[in-house]
Amino acid sequence: MELAAEEGFDIEDVEGAIEEAGHGPLPVLAVVGRPNVGKSTLVNRIIGRREAVVEDKPGVTRDRVTYEAEWAGRRFKVVDTGGWEQDVLGIDASVAAQAEYAIEAADAVVFVVDAKVGATDTDEAVVRLLRKAGKPVVLCANKVDGPSGEADASYLWSLGLGEPQPVSALHGRGTGDMLDRVLEALPEAPAQTFGTAVGGPRRIALIGRPNVGKSSLLNKVAGEDRVVVNELAGTTRDPVDELIELGGVTWKFVDTAGIRKRVHLQQGADYYASLRTAAAVEKAEVAVILVDASESISVQDQRIVTMAVEAGRAIVVAYNKWDTLDEERRYYLEREIETELGQVAWAPRVNVSAQTGRHMEKLVPAIETALAGWETRVPTGRLNAFLGELAAAHPHPVRGGKQPRILFGTQAGTKPPRFVLFASGFIEAGYRRFIERRLREEFGFEGTPIHISVRVREKRGAKKK
């Protein structure tokens, strides 16, 4: 902190920046309810921008179903569970399915009901699901635009979920009071502590687009004699997590139901899969991304990779069906990996065959490598010596007659590694990427995303208003 003061930074600002970057995983809020009650409109209101899809139609493709939000200085993630229509599986089944996977990954739930329509049989079915899950619930009575609407909302006491929060998601009425209740229900984001041991078996999400061989791979690594526990935290229909022994160590594979139970839906299958993948990634520490090496790398493959990176998980990429490739396909696959999956060039890679079991023994070392990178901590003194040498050898380009300097830096957290750099001016994105590359060359960080945030020193003498 002495260095911060010498360089003209406000100590409180520095401490705040480090604390903000150093939090562990953010708490998760799921927004659930039947179609057309205004879930996506409410999500847009919560996150403060028009980003969620506002049509409740099955088959609407979304790159993301998880968004980051902030209220009263606290940050959290919002899972939007919109996107289902009555003719997907029958309304009860479709709502129960999408709600169940979101609730599984959530710390608290906002249950949205149309106050004008009142409680329906479908709403009652969701209430039963919420009671079974045991998660904190905030009941949102939406489409309340005035006193008559508040009277409608009061009827929702009958659901037995406590006081209904009268809200108009469209106009913003009542959303502040509702979010205050949400903060009461959500746990605080855990502070980051270096070297904290993770309780229980390490958690793995096996993810990938449909039909890449996830089921075959899971069966191959598990084997009936090696499944330690089959139904942990089971949902109403099928097991969610499985404990599997690999390399003499027990690992928890999360949401194996989504792998073992093949989903055959005429509509909404992509959305169903992406929601399920997002929920699995949220619960995991490491994502093993399975790619079908016999086919061209698809946009969906890239989306799944991006989802895991943005979630900040340790990552291993496994290329399945490797034994089926001829020399020509291997050549073109290498080119595709360079161009399409360059964003995870740092991730350990294993070439496997779920069918024959080829190279399965390489999976555990790759996972362990990724977790080690994910938990790597660089001492502050060593980090600043590295930054000083880097800036001396490769200074930031001059812009507008000025050359921004990195004054000092610190690692605010791990899982994934998060760094805060304090600078005399704006640091361009290209230079940040250069710093990340050199950090990886110097300290490893194999198998993990790295987050770098920059705080710029205010001009000396500038008064805060």
UniProtKB/Swiss-Prot annotation:
GO molecular function: ATP hydrolysis activity; GTP binding; ribosome binding
Coiled coil: none
Any single GO BP term: ribosome biogenesis
SMART domains per record: AAA (SM00382)
Highest taxon of source: Bacteria
One Pfam family linked to the record: KH_dom-like
UniProt keyword list: GTP-binding, Nucleotide-binding, Repeat, Ribosome biogenesis
Subunit structure: Associates with the 50S ribosomal subunit.
Family: Belongs to the TRAFAC class TrmE-Era-EngA-EngB-Septin-like GTPase superfamily. EngA (Der) GTPase family.
Role, per record: GTPase that plays an essential role in the late steps of ribosome biogenesis.
PANTHER family per record: GTPASE DER
Stated name of the protein: GTPase Der
Organism field: Streptomyces coelicolor (strain ATCC BAA-471 / A3(2) / M145)
Upper taxonomic lineage: Bacteria, Bacillati, Actinomycetota, Actinomycetes, Kitasatosporales
